[in-house]
């Protein structure tokens, strides 16, 4: 429907005034002069990239990864950093827990010589560093480990036993309002690792909650719930963890998908194991008995030998990965893999 000529003139004058006052690009029509596709970074897990629907975690957004202790939260973020560095991106790690192991990070493929690292004294300092890095436009990925360790300055300077009700939640709420715009403008991905706490007196429903108030839940474009669901064994020796990640919130694709993969101790996510499983599932890799074949050529007897072949033939592995992504990404299947928990779906005040 055509807009009245006088209204068009008034709109053009208003747009011109806004651009003159706030700069070019401060207002635009949604479909013009911008890519509608969200740029993403791989998580290091093929099945999780597919569950996210866009091929990875979105740039310019806030992501929250939470779960119990030793569930693989830090490992997953280090794999994201390794993926970003392989693409030539600059990454920073805000180590509020003072627990980052550089030897382990290097084993996961992180270039620790080019990884920016900060161990802030207070929560305010950590969030100000995040904001400064985002505003610089020179850092592509920032990881904060963890929200629970972002202690307000007043709490650190006070006595043990003093009451500091709502301080951390207020600090996070203020920081998220400030960070959201800067992250979008600089196209910086900000990942918060978070811990789980139990609500007291919950008789029905899930008593679990995350720390730092509700602001992060609102501002996060993606929320991932990561859990250890079993052990990976070689004989009697435990060599890794079976891990399940649920996409609890997703603003870039259909939510409520889940992915399962292995995290091997000292190696990280078992990417090639996922590649074999998904390749067989999508009939890209043929499996007859214990033998695996690709393009009519036998690649190994048993899954371990098939994985070894893929590691030795990166071109074939890349080809299979590309085909799997083309088959499974951006399909129209929006059917959820799990039922969302009422605690995750409820709307509450974002300031606390």
UniProtKB/Swiss-Prot annotation:
Pfam families: RecA (PF00154), RecA_C (PF21096). It is found in: Cytoplasm. The keyword DNA repair applies. One of its GO terms (molecular function) is ATP binding. It comes from the Bacteria. Its main location: cytoplasm. The keyword ATP-binding applies. ATP binds at residues 67-74. InterPro entries: AAA+_ATPase (IPR003593), DNA_recomb/repair_RecA (IPR013765), DNA_recomb/repair_RecA_CS (IPR020584), P-loop_NTPase (IPR027417), RecA-like_C (IPR049261), RecA-like_N (IPR049428), RecA_ATP-bd (IPR020588), RecA_C_sf (IPR023400). SUPFAM superfamilies: P-loop containing nucleoside triphosphate hydrolases, RecA protein, C-terminal domain. GO terms for cellular component: cytosol. PANTHER family: MITOCHONDRIAL DNA REPAIR PROTEIN RECA HOMOLOG-RELATED (PTHR45900:SF1), RECA (PTHR45900). Belongs to the RecA family. Can catalyze the hydrolysis of ATP in the presence of single-stranded DNA, the ATP-dependent uptake of single-stranded DNA by duplex DNA, and the ATP-dependent hybridization of homologous single-stranded DNAs. It interacts with LexA causing its activation and leading to its autocatalytic cleavage. NCBIfam families: tigrfam_recA. This is Protein RecA.
């Amino acid at each position: 429907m055509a807009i009245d000529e006088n209204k068009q003139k008034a709109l053009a004058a208003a747009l011109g005034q806004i651009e003159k006052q706030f700069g070019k690009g401060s207002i635009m029509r949604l479909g013009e002069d911008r890519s509608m596709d969200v740029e993403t970074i791989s998580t290091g897990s093929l099945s999780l990239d597919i569950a996210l629907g866009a091929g990875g975690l979105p740039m310019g957004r806030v992501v929250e990864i939470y779960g119990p202790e030793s569930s693989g939260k830090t490992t997953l973020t280090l794999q994201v950093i390794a993926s970003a560095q392989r693409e030539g991106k600059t990454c920073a790690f805000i180590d509020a827990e003072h627990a980052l192991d550089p030897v382990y990070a290097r084993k996961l493929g992180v270039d620790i010589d080019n990884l920016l690292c900060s161990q802030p004294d207070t929560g305010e300092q950590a969030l100000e560093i995040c904001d400064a890095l985002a505003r610089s436009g020179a850092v592509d990925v920032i990881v904060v480990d963890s929200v629970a360790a972002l202690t307000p300055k007043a709490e650190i300077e006070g006595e043990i036993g003093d009451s500091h009700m709502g301080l951390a939640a207020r600090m996070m709420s203020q920081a998220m309002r400030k960070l959201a715009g800067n992250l979008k403008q600089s196209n910086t991905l900000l990942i918060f690792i978070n811990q789980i706490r139990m609500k007291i007196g919950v008789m029905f429903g899930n008593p679990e909650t995350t720390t730092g108030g509700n602001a992060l839940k609102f501002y996060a474009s993606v929320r991932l719930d990561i859990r250890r669901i079993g052990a990976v064994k070689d004989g009697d020796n435990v060599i890794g963890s079976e891990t399940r990640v649920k996409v609890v919130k997703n603003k870039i694709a259909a939510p409520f998908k889940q992915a399962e993969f292995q995290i091997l101790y000292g190696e990280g996510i078992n990417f090639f194991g996922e590649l074999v499983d998904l390749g067989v599932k999508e009939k890209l890799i043929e499996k007859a008995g214990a033998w695996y074949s690709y393009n009519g050529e036998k690649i190994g007897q048993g899954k371990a030998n098939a994985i070894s072949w893929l590691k030795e033939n990166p071109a074939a592995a890349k080809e299979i990965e590309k085909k799997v992504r083309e088959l499974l990404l951006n399909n129209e299947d929006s059917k959820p893999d799990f039922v969302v928990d009422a605690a995750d779906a409820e709307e509450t005040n974002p300031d606390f």
